[in-house]
Amino acid sequence: MTKKKVFCVQFKGRQRFLRLLGDSSKAKGLRSGFVILKSKESIGLHNTGLSEEVISIINGSGLVCYGKKNSVKIKKNSFVYIPPETLHNVINTSKDLLKYIYTTARVK
């Protein structure tokens, strides 16, 4: 088994999407990324599949919509947990950029 090493990723420039973890040589089961959404923009409806997901809001505000008609308001310094097999979308409802970090971990 290859020994994993501690590493640091620096956010550079104005990238709208930056994968932080996802390369199996860096992490065993975690996946993570940094996302920037413009006003009224969404990440798109997607499913967590066999993974749990957490979203940590760094800037802005918006909604996490999940299931058929459910949503939770998000804003700077908030944290959202999304269970496995959950259809969801992240939407920027503010005039400011919505910046967040997502992390997923396979549980099944």
Can you describe what each PLM-predicted range is?
Residues 25-26, 50, 69, 95-96:
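Short strand-connecting beta-turns/loops that link adjacent beta-strands
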Residues 32-36, 54, 71, 79-81:
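Conserved hydrophobic/aromatic beta-strand scaffold that supports enzyme active sites
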Residues 42, 48-76:
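A short beta-strand-loop-beta hairpin characteristic of the jelly-roll/cupin
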Residues 1-31, 44:
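A short, N-terminal "cap"/entry segment at the start of jelly-roll beta-barrel domains
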Residues 30-32, 42, 52, 97-99:
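Intrinsic-disorder/low-complexity, polar/charged segments enriched in Ser/Thr/Lys/Arg/Asp/Glu/Gln
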Residues 75-76, 84-108:
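Ligand-binding loop in jelly-roll beta-barrel domains
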Residues 26-28, 38-42, 61, 106-108:
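Short, charged/polar surface micro-motifs in flexible loops or helix N-caps
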